[in-house]
Structures are given as C-alpha cells and as structure tokens.
Amino acid sequence: IYTNNKMKTKVYRFCLMVVMAIVPLAISATTAYGSNDKDIVRNCTAAPNGEKRCSYALKKEYQAVEHRISNKLLLLRPADDGVFVDSESKRAYANTIRNILLSTLNDAEIAVISRGKANCLNIKIGKDGKALLVEMVLGEDCDNIISQSHIKKVLKRVARVKANGIRDLRVNQYYDYYMSIVATQHSVR
C-alpha cells in the first residue's frame, strides 16, 4: 500500500509538471499577435436580401495605441469609412493590393518572386478601427529569395501609388494592437 501511494504521488507530480509546462505555451500562442476576440467589437445587421453583414473594429482603448515601425506592415486608409461589411469586400481589397503590388514591381523583381513556391509572398488584410492593415508575409520558401529590406523598398514604392479609390497609402505607421481577422490569402506568383 505504501509503495502504491508513493507511485501515485510521483504520477500526480509528473502530471502537474506537464500541465504547468503546457499552460504558458498555450497562453503565449493565443496572444502571439497581440490581439484576440475580446479586443474586437463586432456589429452585425441584416441586409435587405437577408444576408448578415458584419463590421469589425478594435475597442477604443486600442485604437490610439500607435507604437512602433514594422517593415512588413502597410497601413492604408480607404476613401470611404473603411468598414468591412462582408468577405467579398475583403477579397476586393486583397485583389486591389495585389494588383498595386504587381504594378509597382518591375519584370526582374516579379521573376525573383516567381522563383519561390506558392507561399513565398502572401498578402493578408486585417483591420484596426477605420484603417486597413495589409501584411506582407514571407513564407519559409522565400527566406533566401527576398530580403526584408527588399520588401520594405517595395512597400515604399507601393505607398506612392494611388489606385481604385484608395487614398493616403502610407508605410511605417500602424497600431500595435490589430485585428487577427484575415482576408483570403493571395500569393504573388
């Protein structure tokens, strides 16, 4: 009986250690992007055709947190109030950004990107208040093909382009807390 109790104690201690090791990892995984559902205000209304349309915004306390510069994020403000109403709007913005990016690259740069695999360079669209966030994501297959400085150069060139009703396209400014809601990814091939 004594041996069994001793073994039970060891098992309990081991299980406790495992749980204590896993919990911090789980917490850090959910907060890796500095944003989760509790930071987001969602407003949904029914459209005349019965379709549910939702807009998303960060809570006010996060909207004013302007923090640091990133060479991977591009902040752009659309000509309207910038509220996404449905996934189709998100997709339209994603396509617009993809087209702007392609139009600012020269043939040699497009060829360099094309040598990567499909997930070499992806475009994600998120939202912070009334501004849109466009994130240029370098995939693992792209590490040795395109440098961070190259992406920054491309983004600065994109920032000078005005197209499809989008104005005030700017780089090097974004809010630290941003929505993790992401549009469909588009690979630049």
Per-range role (PLM):
Residues 31-189:
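Charge-biased low-complexity segments
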